């Protein structure tokens, strides 16, 4: 296959480039519509009890409250004649909106729970209709119309899940724009520093642009057939920019290395495709395999990242394999055009490089050099011992976000906790007596302060008349029960209450479904934790198989998996220290809270995949030299000498694209950017620079061990580099800073 790719590039270079330009333009046009199709949310399991409860409420009762309008009277209390007149006019207008249902307010119920403690603010509750796509559009339109000042007499601010989702969607776009403004110029500067040539520096960016536009087109197509999270665009941008540049860097470096040996342009391209091209293809396979594990999770937030990640990796690799070679053919020696003032040719041999010297130093005393590094990484991982998990809420938004401010006001200025109430829905008729008995038992559970049913209100076992909104709790073929608690939403106690409610014996012949934000958290934890063993198993198994096919050894995959696990736990430990314990909260401007579970899973797959990316970069050259007859120690020294600077440069470039998202205002996107970028640097420096040579030295010849039958299997089906390259090939011409 690689021979055909090389020959196609050599014989039809300009035709391939024309096709690539046309395809890129088409992908750009298709991808431009992606943003309007993508959705917020996606953290719930569609098959979970809480999601089914919400769906049943939507179907039978007009929907749960997902929009809270906080209305403030400008001239005093909201129950003055003037304020009441304007308030009722606002509610009447809202009830005419076809996109709203179940509009309830203080002015038409006189419910004390909808009036602030000082009487200056009141709540209007409503449900925004529609599937996730339409609901998001409806919420945006409604907020445009009602958020702000009403009749010059009332101030209206929006909160609730619909408003939080709207604010998140807006923030995602703003964060992406800022990250791109930071990452692209910094990346170009680093590329100029690495290559010392304007032309060579621009080529990897071309691959990155193709990868990003292609992945946006992929997301646009996917959004037509399934729900796709809007935050997937951030992953495609970071991965597309980073991997496109990484793969381009690897191809260009090998091409320049071959030109430096005196090879013709055509032979240099052939050799580049056969060696670096194979490495790119294999590296992309390992990264894609890790990201594909996200597809086992039912939450579309995670599945979106799986689709987006696999797609952008495939497009980046395909661009490097099919677009970069014809570019190199057309440019030839002009790839070094536009030399920067600081650039000078590096003619030093591999043995003289800093990475070769580091490898030799480590391998002289492998245990002595590895143990301190390992100790530091394990200390970094120690915060994982206290990790707790949660799901995103308004606290992931910046403090000045309106929906977050509304939530804070509700908690501070209003009595009760109605917006966080557990919602119990029964999809069949229930007689009054068993319904009352069930509600009475619910009201006596620890943490419950009030239970609302269609027939009465229950407080600690005492029944009183039904509340103003009780009519909406009953349907001919269903009942709805609201359990209001005194507990902090998403706290351990609130989650325990969910378990207590579900454990309670329901009315005979009924099967209640329990929903609400606390139930959603419990279900999300259960759903994700239930799939984690499968995801980890798939990642480990596919990685082991791919690395065995590449190396012919069963020891090398185990060594790689162990070292990647160290990178992973160190990174997650540091993220726990920062985002859960809040040590950098003042600097980064986020609110410390439990680790977002979906993002933690996402980081596991990304960190694992990117660690394998650099594992392949380094191992491919070590194996190449070992296959040429060098012993393990010599192959490691010379392999790191050849790849050390390339891996370091690639890591810095990829880290920049992720660190740029550390400027995000959404805290879980900050964690995504900082965590992924940090993991890349840990892996490229501490793991590849110290622990890999130390482990290889300690393993010695056994590093390449495989049972006889597997060696036979590998000789027939394994992957390997093509014909060996000249042993004395000098380093590529790159700039030394």
For every predicted segment, state its role.
Residues 46-66, 75-165, 386-585, 668, ...:
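Structured non-transmembrane domains adjacent to transmembrane bundles in polytopic membrane proteins
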Residues 42-43:
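Membrane-proximal amphipathic alpha-helices
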Residues 1-37, 100, 130-389, 507-509, ...:
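Membrane-embedded transmembrane helical bundles of large multi-pass transporters/channels
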Residues 74-76, 198-199:
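Conserved nucleotide-binding/hydrolysis micro-motifs of P-loop NTPases
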């Amino acid at each position: 296959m690689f021979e055909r790719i090389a020959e196609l590039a050599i014989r039809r270079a300009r035709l391939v480039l024309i096709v690539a330009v046309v395809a890129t333009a088409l992908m750009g046009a298709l991808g431009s519509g992606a943003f309007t199709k993508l959705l917020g949310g996606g953290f719930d399991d569609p098959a979970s009890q809480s999601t089914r409860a919400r769906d049943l409420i939507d179907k039978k009762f007009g929907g749960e409250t997902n929009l809270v309008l906080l209305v403030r009277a400008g001239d005093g209390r909201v129950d003055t004649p003037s304020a009441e007149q304007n308030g009722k006019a606002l509610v009447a207008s809202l009830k005419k909106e076809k996109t709203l249902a179940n509009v309830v307010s203080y002015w038409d119920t006189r419910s004390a729970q909808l009036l602030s403690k000082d009487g200056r603010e009141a709540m209007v509750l409503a449900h925004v209709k529609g599937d996730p796509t339409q609901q998001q559009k409806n919420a945006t339109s409604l907020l445009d119309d009602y958020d702000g000042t009403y009749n010059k007499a009332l101030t209206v601010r929006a909160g609730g899940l619909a408003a939080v989702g709207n604010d998140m969607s807006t923030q995602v776009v703003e964060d992406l724009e800022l990250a791109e403004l930071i990452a692209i110029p910094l990346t170009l500067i680093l590329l100029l520093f690495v290559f010392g040539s304007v032309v060579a520096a621009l080529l990897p960016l071309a691959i990155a642009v193709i990868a990003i536009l292609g992945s946006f087109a992929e997301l646009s197509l996917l959004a037509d057939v399934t729900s796709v999270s809007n935050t997937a665009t951030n992953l495609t941008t970071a991965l597309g920019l980073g991997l496109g540049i990484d793969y381009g860097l690897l191809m260009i470096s090998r091409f320049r290395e071959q030109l430096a040996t005196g090879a013709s342009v055509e032979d240099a391209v052939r050799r580049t495709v056969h060696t670096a091209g194979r490495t790119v293809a294999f590296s992309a396979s390992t990264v894609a395999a890790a990201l594909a594990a996200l597809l086992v999770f039912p939450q579309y937030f995670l599945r979106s990242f799986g689709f987006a990640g696999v797609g952008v990796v495939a497009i980046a690799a395909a661009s490097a394999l099919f677009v970069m070679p014809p570019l190199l053919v057309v440019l030839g020696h002009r790839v070094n055009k536009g030399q920067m003032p600081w650039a000078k040719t590096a003619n030093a041999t591999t043995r003289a490089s800093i990475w070769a010297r580091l490898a030799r130093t480590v391998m002289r005393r492998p245990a002595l050099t590895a143990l301190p590094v390992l100790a530091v990484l394990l200390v970094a991982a120690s915060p994982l011992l206290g990790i707790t998990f949660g799901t995103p809420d308004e606290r992931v938004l910046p403090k000045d976000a309106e929906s977050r401010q509304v939530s804070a006001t509700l908690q501070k200025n209003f009595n009760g906790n109605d917006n966080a109430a557990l919602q119990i829905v029964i999809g069949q008729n229930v007689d009054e007596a068993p319904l009352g008995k069930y509600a009475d038992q619910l009201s006596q559970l620890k943490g419950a302060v009030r239970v609302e049913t269609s027939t009465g209100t229950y407080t600690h076992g005492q029944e009183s008349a039904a509340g103003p909104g009780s009519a909406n709790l009953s349907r001919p073929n269903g009942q709805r029960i609201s359990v209001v608690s005194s507990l902090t939403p998403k706290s351990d106690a609130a989650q325990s209450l969910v378990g207590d409610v579900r454990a309670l014996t329901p009315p005979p012949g009924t099967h209640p479904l329990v929903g609400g934000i606390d139930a959603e958290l419990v279900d999300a934890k259960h759903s994700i934790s239930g799939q984690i063993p499968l995801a980890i198993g798939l990642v480990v198994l596919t990685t082991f198989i791919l690395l065995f096919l590449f190396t012919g050894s069963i020891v090398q995959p185990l060594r790689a998996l162990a070292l990647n696990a160290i990178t992973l736990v160190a990174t997650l430990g540091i993220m726990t220290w920062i985002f859960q314990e809040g040590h950098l909260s003042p600097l980064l401007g986020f609110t410390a809270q439990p680790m977002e579970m979906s993002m933690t899973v996402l980081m596991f797959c990304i960190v694992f995949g990117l660690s394998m990316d650099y594992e392949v970069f380094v191992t491919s050259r070590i194996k190449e030299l070992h296959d040429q007859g060098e012993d393990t120690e010599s192959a490691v020294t010379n392999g790191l000498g050849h790849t050390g600077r390339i891996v370091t440069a690639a890591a810095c470039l990829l880290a920049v694209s992720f660190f740029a998202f550390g400027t995000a205002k959404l805290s879980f996107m900050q964690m995504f950017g900082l965590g992924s970028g940090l993991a890349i640097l840990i892996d490229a420096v501490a793991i590849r620079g110290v622990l890999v040579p130390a482990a290889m030295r300690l393993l010695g010849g056994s590093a390449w061990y495989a049972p006889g039958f597997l060696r036979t299997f590998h000789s027939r089906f394994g992957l390997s580099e093509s014909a060996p390259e000249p042993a004395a090939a000098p380093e590529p011409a790159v700039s030394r800073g």
